[in-house]
Structure formats: structure tokens, C-alpha cells
């Protein structure tokens, strides 16, 4: 486990220091297209639909980012190589029917619809000559002579992975009384992963088929709003979602979905005839199996492909959010917010390489806050001009990497990072 290991620190390296090579590259191309269709049957019933296509290509060859590793000589780093060559195509479609009607004195706002998508990933795997490019010292780049040549990297396999997803849903917002509204809904989701195909490019393009898989689930959603006073509303909700995970595991298989339970409880206050709104929400979110970018590829090398992911275990987020909106003067808008989030691993497999139960996730600060103030001129030569400022605060957090059970490092991979504030004018 990670008990008793020394804390890590950030090396005293200037921001301007470049630890890559002069030949490395990362080329990405994105293409998107969409079409929408809207139709009104009458004042109460409307139909809308959307079709879209997305394509993403990435061609990457570089030394990898620095890892939390131990070297006897301070600052010494053996630079590993990474090669990524992927193409993703994503076809989606969605149709919704919105309607309003009454059953007796009870008012209903109905939403019913369906969505589907087809996802294809083509991944080239390479045989890179030498997993380690060379060794440098990040504290003093003059200690070693750096390589400048481009290593050989030959295509070995092409893996094509298709995924099909479909969902159908219905929800109804019911006004039981002028003070009480009830939201109830359910969604059925299906994910099919047909067998992927691996083409061995150096073996006469022979093809091997992987395993197919499918999963489906019903996901309920329920909520209630109670207007305690004209300007005070209380609300509570629960939702269960069948969250499909994009990307592939390190063996180019599709990831199973994650099940997420979310609970919310809050109050909405309106003061000063609508000039001031204050909302407070408490929440708990449980993800039964969080998908994150894989640390290593199937050969044990540091992973640079953000499309390769791993299921890391159950996480729990407990938090509270405060939102304030004010419009005291004509043209003046003030928005402020604060959030507290406590996110930890609450259940992990417990075997070697799994994350440590109870540890806070990296890059999840406990405290964040933001504020904006804008003024829009409505008279004279400056009519329509908007000026303002915004500030964002991110609290203390851990950078680096979460620790794993029986990890090779005898120190913590968590790096304490101080909070910061940015101001834009």
C-alpha cells in the first residue's frame, strides 16, 4: 500500500524549461457537421431532432511527460517514447417530443424521446525502437548530451473497434398543487460492443476477431419542488444514470458503462423583488466505477493516448454549492459562486496496482469560487458596450498521480499544489 511513503514535491524547474525534443509532434484534426429539424404540431406539442457527425484524428510521436519515478541522482530522468495514431468517427441522432396537457386539474409537461450513436475507433499500434529515448537531467540540461535523431517506429497492428448505443426515455413534470411539483422519469439504455478486429500488418494482413459484449439498464429519476413561500422553494432529487464510457481499455476493448447515483437537496431564495437570487445545493454523487485515462499501456509503458482508459473503482463526491445572482441597478449584473467538493476513492479492487481506498483524487480541489461583474451601457455613444471583470479561485489540491497498492515507488506520488486566483478584465 501507500502507507508510510514519503511525500513528493515539485522539482525547482523554471516554467520555461523544455524537456522534449526538437522533432516531436502532435497533430490533431477535428471535423464536425450537424443538422436539426424542429416542428410544432400546435401550441402545446413540439418535435425536435438532431443528427451529427464528428471525426477526430490524432498523430503523435514524442517523449512522454515526466513520471513520478525515483532516480538515485537528483533530477535524472530517462525519457520514455510514446506513439499514438488514431482515428475516431462518431455518428449520433436524437429525437424529442415535448408536450403540455392536463388530467383533470393536474398539469403535465411531458418529454419523450430516443437517441442513438455509432462509434468507430481505428488505432494503429507501433513497434518503437527503444522504449527509452535517452537520459537527461531536468535540473541541469548540460549534464548529458541529448539525442536529436528520430527513432524508428513501424506499424504493427490496426485495431478497429465499433460501439453501438441506444436509449429511450420519458419524463413528466407534474404540478400536483400550486406549491408542489413532482418530476418522474425513466430511461432505458443499451450498449453493444461488436467484436473488434485486429489486422496484423507485418503478417500478410491477417485478421483476428475479439469478443463481443452488451449491457443494458433502466435508470430512474425523481424529484420534488415545494414552494414554501412566494420567494422560497425547496427541492430534492435522485437520479440513477447508465453512463457510457468513451474510449478503449489498454487491450483495445470497449469499456463497460458506469452506474452513477446522484442525490441533491437544496433551497432557492428570491429577494428584493427578483433583484437578488441565492441558491444553495448539497449533493452526493457515487460513481460505481470511474473511468480515467490509463497510466500505462499494455506493455507497461507510460500511456500518452487519452483514448486508452481504465476503470479505477468506486468514487464518492460530497459537496455543497452556493450561487448568487444580483441585478441591483439597470445594466449591472453580478454573479458569484462557491463550491466545496470532497471526492475520494471509496471502493477499489484492493489488488496490486489498484488505487488506494480513501485517497482524494488528484486535480480535485476541495474549494473553488468565482465572481463576475458586468455593466452594460444603455445610453449615449456607449450604448450597448459591456465592460466588466471576473475572478476565479481554485483551492489547494493534489497534482501528480494517485498512489497504487504495492507501487514500485517508496514515496507518495501525490504532489501538494497551492491554490491560485486568476482575474480577467
Where are these regions (language model features)?
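Acidic/polar loop-and-plug regions of large Gram-negative outer-membrane beta-barrel proteins
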Residues: 1-40, 55-88, 132-156, 161, ...
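Residues that define the transmembrane beta-barrel architecture of outer-membrane proteins
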Residues: 27-31, 87-91, 162-166, 214-218, ...
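Surface-exposed extracellular loop regions of Gram-negative outer-membrane beta-barrel proteins
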Residues: 30-37, 44-100, 163-198, 217-243, ...
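Transmembrane beta-strands of outer-membrane beta-barrel pores
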Residues: 31, 53-59, 99-101, 114-120, ...
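Membrane-embedded beta-barrel scaffold of Gram-negative outer-membrane proteins
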Residues: 38-42, 46-52, 56-64, 233-234, ...
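Outer-membrane beta-barrel channels and translocator barrels
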Residues: 42-44, 98, 102-105, 177-181, ...
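Structural signature of Gram-negative outer-membrane beta-barrels, strongest in the C-terminal barrel
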Residues: 88, 107-111, 115-117, 159-287, ...
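Gram-negative outer-membrane beta-barrel transporters
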Residues: 310-402
Amino acid at each position: 500500500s501507500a502507507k508510510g511513503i514519503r511525500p513528493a514535491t515539485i522539482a525547482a524547474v523554471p516554467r520555461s524549461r523544455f524537456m522534449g525534443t526538437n522533432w516531436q509532434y502532435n497533430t490533431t484534426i477535428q471535423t464536425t457537421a450537424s443538422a436539426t429539424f424542429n416542428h410544432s404540431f400546435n401550441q402545446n406539442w413540439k418535435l425536435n431532432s438532431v443528427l451529427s457527425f464528428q471525426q477526430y484524428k490524432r498523430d503523435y510521436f514524442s517523449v512522454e511527460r515526466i513520471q513520478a519515478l525515483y532516480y538515485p541522482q537528483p533530477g535524472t530522468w530517462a525519457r520514455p517514447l510514446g506513439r499514438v495514431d488514431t482515428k475516431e468517427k462518431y455518428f449520433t441522432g436524437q429525437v424529442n417530443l415535448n408536450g403540455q396537457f392536463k388530467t383533470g386539474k393536474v398539469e403535465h409537461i411531458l418529454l419523450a424521446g430516443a437517441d442513438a450513436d455509432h462509434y468507430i475507433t481505428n488505432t494503429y499500434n507501433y513497434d518503437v525502437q527503444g522504449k527509452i529515448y535517452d537520459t537527461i537531467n531536468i535540473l541541469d540540461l548540460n549534464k548529458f548530451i541529448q539525442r536529436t535523431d528520430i527513432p524508428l517506429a513501424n506499424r504493427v497492428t490496426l485495431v478497429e473497434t465499433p460501439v453501438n448505443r441506444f436509449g429511450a426515455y420519458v419524463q413528466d413534470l407534474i404540478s400536483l398543487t400550486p406549491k408542489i411539483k413532482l418530476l418522474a422519469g425513466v430511461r432505458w439504455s443499451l450498449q453493444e460492443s461488436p467484436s473488434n478486429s485486429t489486422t496484423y500488418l507485418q503478417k500478410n494482413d491477417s485478421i483476428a476477431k475479439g469478443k463481443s459484449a452488451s449491457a443494458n439498464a433502466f435508470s430512474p429519476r425523481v424529484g420534488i419542488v415545494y414552494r414554501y413561500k412566494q420567494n422560497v422553494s425547496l427541492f430534492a432529487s435522485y437520479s440513477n444514470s447508465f453512463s457510457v464510457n468513451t474510449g478503449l481499455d489498454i487491450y483495445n476493448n470497449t469499456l463497460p458503462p458506469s452506474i452513477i447515483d446522484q442525490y441533491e437537496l437544496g433551497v432557492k431564495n428570491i429577494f428584493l423583488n427578483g433583484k437578488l437570487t441565492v441558491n444553495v445545493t448539497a449533493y452526493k454523487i457515487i460513481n460505481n466505477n470511474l473511468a480515467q485515462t490509463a497510466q500505462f499501456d499494455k506493455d507497461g509503458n507510460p500511456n500518452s493516448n487519452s483514448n486508452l482508459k481504465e476503470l479505477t473503482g468506486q468514487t464518492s463526491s460530497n459537496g455543497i454549492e452556493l450561487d448568487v445572482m444580483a441585478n441591483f441597478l439597470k445594466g449591472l449584473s453580478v454573479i458569484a459562486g462557491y463550491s466545496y467538493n470532497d471526492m475520494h476513492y471509496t471502493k477499489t479492487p484492493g489488488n496490486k496496482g489498484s488505487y488506494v481506498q480513501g485517497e482524494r483524487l488528484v486535480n480535485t480541489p476541495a474549494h473553488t469560487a468565482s465572481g463576475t461583474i458586468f455593466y452594460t451601457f444603455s445610453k449615449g455613444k456607449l450604448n450597448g458596450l459591456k465592460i466588466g471583470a471576473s475572478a476565479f479561485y481554485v483551492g489547494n489540491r493534489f497534482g501528480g498521480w494517485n498512489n497504487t497498492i504495492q507501487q514500485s515507488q517508496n514515496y507518495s506520488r501525490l504532489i501538494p499544489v497551492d491554490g491560485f486566483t486568476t482575474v480577467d478584465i
